[in-house]
């Protein structure tokens, strides 16, 4: 995938393209290169703050790197400026999940899914908030919903498997 990005950057002079930077950050995040994805997200923030704010990868890298204050600021900035976007409530839910206020996180993930029922990252966050409270049935339902929304994506299936392992349900 990096070769394709390199060709686009060199041949078409798209090195500063916010769309390309966002795509690279997402690819790095999916390859578990969280720090590199975060660095690109910060570059995206400088170039295109609107696209940065709409990017689940921007939110997820802050979550995964335990950047509580940055995530708090971004989440509340999004909620204030874009209350009709699922990313806003997803970010707020991620913040509350990060500080282990799981029931509060659930309510914000639920709000994100009510704003856009097809926003799969919120369903995964919703499942994680349920799993953190040992509510396995609800967690599995949320992960299955995410799996239906993203057929072929491994992430919801990974969370389903992790939930089976967590509950020692090996059937």
Regions found by a protein language model. Name each.
Residues 10, 43-46, 77-80, 111-114, ...:
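Conserved structural position within tetratricopeptide repeats
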């Amino acid at each position: 995938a990096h070769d394709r990005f390199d060709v686009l950057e060199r041949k078409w002079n798209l090195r500063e393209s916010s769309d390309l930077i966002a795509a690279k950050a997402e690819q790095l995040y999916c390859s578990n290169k969280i720090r590199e994805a975060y660095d690109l997200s910060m570059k995206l923030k400088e170039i295109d703050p609107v696209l940065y704010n709409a990017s689940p990868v921007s939110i997820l890298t802050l979550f995964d790197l335990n950047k509580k204050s940055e995530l708090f600021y971004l989440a509340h900035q999004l909620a204030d400026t874009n209350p009709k976007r699922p990313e806003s409530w997803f970010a707020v839910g991620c913040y509350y999940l990060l500080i282990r206020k799981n029931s509060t996180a659930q309510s914000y993930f639920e709000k994100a899914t009510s704003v856009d029922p097809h926003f799969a990252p919120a369903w995964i966050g919703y499942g994680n908030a349920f799993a953190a409270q040992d509510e396995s049935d609800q967690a599995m339902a949320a992960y299955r919903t995410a799996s239906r929304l993203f057929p072929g994506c491994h992430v919801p299936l990974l969370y389903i498997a992790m939930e089976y392992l967590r509950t020692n349900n090996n059937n």
